[in-house]
Amino acid sequence: MSKNLLIELGLEELPAYVVTPSEKQLGERLATFLTENRLSFEDIQTFSTPRRLAVRVSGLADQQTDLTEDFKGPAKKIALDADGNFSKAAQGFVRGKGLTTDAIEFREVKGEEYVYVTKHEAGKPAKEVLLGVTEVLSAMTFPVSMHWANNSFEYIRPVHTLTVLLNDEALELDFLDIHSGRVSRGHRFLGTETTITSADSYEADLRSQFVIADAKERQEMIVEQIKTLEVEQGVQVDIDEDLLNEVLNLVEFPTAFMGSFEAKYLDVPEEVLVTSMKNHQRYFVVRDQAGHLMPNFVSVRNGNDQAIENVIKGNEKVLVARLEDGEFFWREDQKLQIADLVAKLTNVTFHEKIGSLAEHMDRTRVIAASLAKEANLSAEEVTAVDRAAQIYKFDLLTGMVGEFDELQGIMGEKYALLAGEDAAVATAIREHYLPDAAGGALPETKVGAVLALAAKLDTLLSFFSVGLIPSGSNDPYALRRATQGIVRILDHFGWRIPMDKLVDSLYDLSFDSLTYANKADVMNFIRARVDKMMGKAAPKDIREAILASSTFVVPEMLAAAEALVKASHTENYKPAVESLSRAFNLAEKADASVQVDPSLFENEQENTLFAAIQGLTLAGSAAQQLEQVFALSPVINDFFDNTMVMAGDQALKNNRLAILSDLVSKAKTIVAFNQLNTK
């Protein structure tokens, strides 16, 4: 008869960002433990709050399944001595399996007999197996951990309780310095210690103590309460998904409420108000039906609605202090001059090994000018790029950004417009930070995109030049994100800028502040980001073939990868790749100094292939170019069928290899076909 298992770990308050991943990890680790220990089950449900992680297993088997395993030992000729008795090798083998030589039998494998033993292990009761379940808890990993009391072990937070129930029976286990039982803790202020009656009564027992154990249910409660406030007040609430996920992991019993602030603060830029509410206070933003910001907010209390008026007043008071700061900085920053702030950037360190922020900006300006030409920007856009590159970090020295660093770039745009800067310049100041996260928004303007590329390129080259190169998962300066941004921007705008030539040109630049170094490492790093951009949809051989092509133009490489993936599912892919791969491999033997001499052709197939190569223009999309190359496959095969490439005559051999070399020089601009796998 199956049973239900409950495990709850009661902890000190957890950081919100670790709650959901830890809940998931607990469920996955327990499922693995049960599977490895041959305990079948029907379902696993996980629970979490800021003060507990829990999991319930439904339909858990009463005992392990029996195990029967066959083990192969030494060959018969080794297992028996000259007298036909079992040798020490055979005896040692069975002893290691906990058996005797009586269990030995011989089985033939590929014409030779070997020792085999069969071991039967009866399944243990589930209750006995579960005594080892604390290894699941011990194996949990967290981004941070701590010691407490006089203990030598570390964990995410101090552990207060451990509840392990098999149906309604409490199992006795020890974890860290805690002995398990059936006692759990209710809400920190509204509840008390409580007894969990059974695995099935878990949610109900905690609910009576003002704890909603199911995170999904808490989320639904929060959303429903906010929707009710929307209807009652006739407003719209921005239910930001990230904020919602954070808030639900800050409360055990949610109660949403609406507060307000004076309308005068709406004169402050919306971004300042939203940042104050959302990022600093974890409040939801309120708008009218037209989408305009209102002097209200929605917050979620960790508790019921008792004395909610006092809670609202307290939250309003805290927010007003933030808004006062924002209003003050908004007013005072407008008195500052951009030129004065830029001049002070010489005293702001970009990195102690690299130099000042002003020096970083100087290098960025030079790179931006070069990129503007490569991207064929208009004269007006070139002027805007140059101006933006001179001032784009000035807002870092404003009071607002000093207080709300999330607003860097955003306030730069606003202050630049107030100072009379061109709109394209102001927008570029904001957009040069983009994308600011994996998959984040990209610059929308060419001016902003060029400035973003230039700033990211100097950041990448500067850090690599002083040896600050990411290793493993360690990337403290977010260079992977910056480089991924470079790749995404180039692809988004379709700028066909050869990265190898661009980087070469940057290394030719001379700056008093820094000399770029470690070019090979930089190129490999960029290649790795392009590889990542090609994604899991492109198999490893396709990605490697693209990266080994002779062209390093990001949009073309990504398009070629997509085209190759689609082509790989067609009938002519395998024969076309095989003929091209053969041509690529032979072309490696060609003498680069030899030019094709048509007078040395001995058959029609040589002439036909040479003419086809001469006519190969590789125009259109990546898919169209791929089709053009694949169309040569029959011609290449005819050539190989009727021509001895490695002829005894040196002149003929060199001429035929030169034909193939001409083919490869064109085809390799798309893909290194000999890197593709057709097996």
Swiss-Prot record:
Q: Give me the reactions it catalyses.
A: tRNA(Gly) + glycine + ATP = glycyl-tRNA(Gly) + AMP + diphosphate
Q: Where in the cell is it found?
A: Cytoplasm
Which GO molecular function terms does the record list? Answer: ATP binding; glycine-tRNA ligase activity
GO CC, sorted alphabetically, is:
cytosol
Q: Which SUPFAM superfamilies match?
A: HD-domain/PDEase-like
Keywords in alphabetical order, please: Aminoacyl-tRNA synthetase, ATP-binding, Cytoplasm, Ligase, Nucleotide-binding, Protein biosynthesis
- Signal peptide segment: none
Task: Give the main location.
Answer: cytoplasm
Q: What is the E.C. number?
A: 6.1.1.14
The GO annotation for biological process reads: glycyl-tRNA aminoacylation
Q: Which InterPro entries match?
A: Gly-tRNA-synth_bsu, Gly-tRNA-synth_heterodimer
HAMAP family associated with the record: Gly_tRNA_synth_beta
* Assembly notes: Tetramer of two alpha and two beta subunits.
Similarity section: Belongs to the class-II aminoacyl-tRNA synthetase family.
What name appears for this protein in its UniProt entry?
Glycine--tRNA ligase beta subunit
Q: Which organism is it from?
A: Streptococcus pyogenes serotype M1
Which gene is transcribed and translated to give this protein?
glyS
